[in-house]
């Protein structure tokens, strides 16, 4: 090719690729689903056709069997009838032949021959040949023997039997042909109905019809053979039946004396052992009576148990009536403002003037009353109301702010006043039933009794005693759900046997909170009361330090004191009293105390609680502190 000429591809050689259209996957999936659905439907139709074909075959078999059985029954009945007729005819012939003369016997033979000729005409060729042979044989015997002998009589009997047999065979064959025709007609009717119902499955039905016809023909042939065999067996069966009937009669006759023997044996047994039988029946009756008595006793015990439950309630009422006689109303000289100490940053009894008290001890006419410190306040004398609006003046024997326990003493000459029975709070159980007796809202609702349970044990509740909006100490209490209202403070908490187990002191008074009251355990209250009776006050150890909570420190204060970052709880020493126990123990300002007496300290309330718990033994306590960011151990003295 020349370089100057432009290279051009002829158009007939230029074959542009055909544009490939977008491959529609959804359409192919839809077509595939439709194809699979058609295949499933075709498969179901084939299965249904097979099922229908099997049903048709079963119905045809059942129809054939029913028809053949019915025909066989009719045939057997007919054969039995013919046999009975033949036997009766033979008996008549036997009787007649003995009384007939020789000419009469010859005439009877001729009649039998004519009857044989008439019967054998409609039979088959094989039967004709057999009869011709029999006739020829009989004729030969007739020529040899004399005509009027006993042999001729026997031959006549044999001929009559042969005639009857030929009749029976002829009837059997005619009935068999009828059966075959009827079975064919029934099968054709069934096939026609099936063809009308299943036009789409002609080929399958045709094949099924052919097989069914073959089966039917084979079955009919077998049945015909069986019928011929049964004819021979029926003779033997009839003989067996007669024999069996005779045996049954004999057995029945033998069993009658046996039954009589058993009845006699039963009667003899009853005569011999009647006493034992009576004893056994009596024992059974006694057992039944005992079981009935036990069941009634169980019912009575259940009734008694329910009545015991009622008596428990009655005991509760008695306990309430008894406790009411030991509870008094306490009023101090300050203006009336009926409240109750609370824990919601406001006090239940802000002015501390009206509440309740419990008489726990009596010496002659002198009664000792247990109440709360926040009711008595700083007064030395208070007014009490008891019985039916009777009043008296009580002297304050002692008070303890930290435990909220005060003891009063009053001289009262009244037989209705009596000290309450004291129990033990260490035996209290969660969920135990209790009664609260007090004077809510003063004398207007005095001797009010409410019922509840112990909702919690060992509750440490923070309380503000000096009204500076700062909690001063944790008070050890147990929680109750009985109704506690202003004026119930100092009231009695009574257990189910009427014993004093606590002294009402606090309640939570916050929105959406109900039924959370707290009582001081009687064991702790009684210990404080005994000490107040002796000394008039409670002396607590004082370490002589001013403290602040670590959680209240500002970030710059933590940096100045070099408090480690992982220390979030504890107390910081802010002040030290000259010659105080804290300074003598080696504490310095800025020390951070995190452990005391092997217990972690959360705040100043817990520090004070641990110190106060050792008010009697005053032992030296080990402490862990941080000083300048370094931890060390020291020992704090309490005396």
From Swiss-Prot:
SMART domains: PDZ. Residues 206-219 have a biased composition (Polar residues). The chain crosses the membrane at residues 277-297. The active site is at residues 374, 404, 489. Residues 1-13, 21-75, 106-187, 195-205, 220-235, 245-262 have a biased composition (Basic and acidic residues). The keyword rRNA processing does not apply. Keywords: Cell membrane, Hydrolase, Membrane, Protease, Serine protease, Transmembrane, Transmembrane helix. It is an enzyme of class 3 (hydrolase). Its EC number is 3.4.21.-. InterPro entries: Chloro_Bact_Ser_Proteases, PDZ, PDZ_sf, Peptidase_S1_PA, Peptidase_S1_PA_chymotrypsin, Peptidase_S1C. It is found in: Cell membrane. Residues 527-629 form the PDZ domain. GO terms for cellular component: plasma membrane. Pfam families: PDZ_2, Trypsin_2. One of its GO terms (biological process) is proteolysis. PANTHER family: PEPTIDASE S12, PROTEASE DO-LIKE 8, CHLOROPLASTIC. Belongs to the peptidase S1C family. This is Serine protease HtrA-like.
């Amino acid at each position: 090719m020349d370089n100057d000429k432009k290279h051009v591809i002829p158009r007939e050689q230029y074959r542009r690729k055909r544009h490939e259209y977008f491959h529609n996957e959804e359409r192919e999936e839809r077509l595939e689903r439709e194809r699979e659905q058609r295949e499933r439907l075709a498969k179901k139709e084939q299965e249904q056709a097979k099922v229908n074909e099997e049903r048709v075959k079963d119905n045809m078999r059942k129809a054939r069997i029913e028809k053949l059985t019915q025909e066989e029954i009719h045939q057997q009945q007919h054969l039995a009838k013919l046999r009975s007729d033949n036997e009766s005819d033979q008996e008549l012939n036997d009787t007649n032949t003995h009384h007939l003369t020789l000419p009469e016997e010859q005439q009877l033979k001729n009649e039998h021959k004519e009857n044989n000729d008439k019967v054998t005409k409609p039979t088959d060729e094989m039967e004709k040949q057999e009869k011709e042979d029999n006739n020829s044989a009989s004729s030969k015997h007739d020529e040899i023997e004399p005509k009027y002998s006993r042999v001729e009589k026997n031959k006549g009997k044999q001929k009559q039997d042969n005639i009857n047999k030929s009749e029976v065979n002829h009837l059997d064959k005619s009935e068999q042909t009828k059966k075959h025709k009827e079975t064919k007609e029934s099968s054709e009717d069934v096939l026609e109905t099936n063809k009308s119902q299943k036009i789409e499955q002609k080929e399958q039905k045709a094949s099924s019809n052919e097989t069914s016809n073959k089966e039917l023909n084979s079955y009919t042939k077998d049945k015909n053979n069986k019928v011929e065999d049964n004819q021979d067996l029926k003779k033997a069966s009839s003989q067996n039946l007669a024999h069996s009937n005779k045996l049954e009669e004999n057995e029945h006759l033998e069993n009658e004396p046996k039954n009589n023997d058993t009845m006699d044996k039963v009667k003899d047994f009853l005569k011999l052992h009647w006493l034992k039988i009576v004893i056994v029946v009596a024992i059974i009756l006694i057992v039944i009576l005992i079981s009935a008595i036990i069941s009634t006793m169980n019912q009575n015990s259940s009734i008694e148990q329910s009545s015991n439950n009622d008596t428990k309630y009655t005991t509760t009422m008695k306990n309430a009536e008894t406790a009411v006689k030991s509870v008094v109303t306490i009023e101090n000289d300050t203006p009336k403002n009926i409240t109750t100490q609370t824990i919601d940053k406001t006090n239940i009894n802000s002015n501390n003037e009206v509440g309740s008290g419990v008489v726990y001890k009596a010496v002659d006419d002198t009664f000792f009353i247990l109440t709360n410190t926040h009711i008595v306040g700083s007064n030395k004398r208070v007014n009490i109301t008891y019985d039916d609006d009777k009043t008296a003046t009580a002297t304050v024997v002692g008070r303890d702010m930290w435990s909220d326990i005060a003891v009063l003493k009053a001289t009262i000459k009244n037989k209705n006043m009596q000290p309450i029975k004291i129990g033990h709070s260490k035996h209290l159980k969660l969920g135990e039933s209790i009664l609260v007796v007090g004077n809510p809202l003063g004398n207007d609702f005095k001797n009010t009794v409410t019922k509840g349970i112990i909702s919690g044990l060992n509750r440490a509740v923070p309380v503000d005693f000096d009204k500076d909006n700062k909690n001063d100490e944790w008070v050890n209490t147990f929680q109750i759900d009985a109704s506690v209202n202003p004026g119930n403070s100092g009231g009695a908490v009574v257990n189910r046997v009427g014993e004093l187990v606590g002294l009402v002191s606090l309640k939570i008074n916050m929105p959406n909170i109900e039924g959370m009251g707290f009582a001081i355990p009687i064991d702790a209250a009684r210990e404080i009361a005994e000490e107040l009776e002796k000394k008039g006050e409670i002396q607590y150890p004082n370490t002589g330090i001013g403290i602040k909570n670590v959680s209240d420190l500002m970030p710059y204060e933590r940096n100045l004191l070099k408090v480690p970052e992982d220390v979030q709880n504890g107390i910081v020493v802010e002040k030290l009293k000259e010659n105080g126990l804290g300074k003598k123990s080696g504490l310095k300002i800025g020390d951070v105390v995190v452990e005391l007496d092997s217990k972690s300290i959360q705040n100043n309330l817990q520090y004070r609680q641990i110190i106060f718990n050792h008010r009697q033994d005053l032992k030296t306590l080990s402490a862990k502190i941080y000083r300048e960011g370094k931890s060390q151990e020291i020992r704090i003295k309490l005396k």
